Amino acid sequence: MFGFLNVYKPVGKTSHDVVAFLRRVTKIKQIGHTGTLDPFAEGVLPICIGKATRLIEYLEDDKAYIGTFCFGKSTDSFDIDGNIVETFEDKVAEDDIQSALKSFEGVIEQMPPIYSAIKIDGKKLYEYAREGKTVDINPRKVTIEKIELRSFDYENQIAEIYIKCSKGTYIRSIANDLGKALNN
């Protein structure tokens, strides 16, 4: 058996959890996904089965996300699961978000989060982070084809942002960088 399958990945599961479940249920060992979704993210996880896994490296199409960004605090992992490293009293305005988003369109340099599966010297970054070790991380070029504010709750400082981007883009890094651009 071979082919492609779009699977809904719920919050709280890793992309690997989904693959492991499918391997167990189908009794097929050759199963892989086309890109990792963070455990706190939910959405469609494209799966390749059997000989289709050989095509994963050729699936370079853009990806689209809707992210929920919370202003007023910064975490070490750039997401809600991380430890808060800084808080901000001032609220951001919707117009300021709209203006700042324009600087993210096109080819940008993005610093991956320390809590990520990117490997340096054969070891995943999150392994270094959990050990409390610092490593030099190089920024990566990514393309943001479209980024737009869908909604904004001023009182709670929560924005819903649509992003169409190249493979390898970290939405968490965009959230962190947007916060920095807004001094928040």
Model-derived features: positions:
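Catalytic/RNA-binding core of pseudouridine synthases
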Residues: 1-184
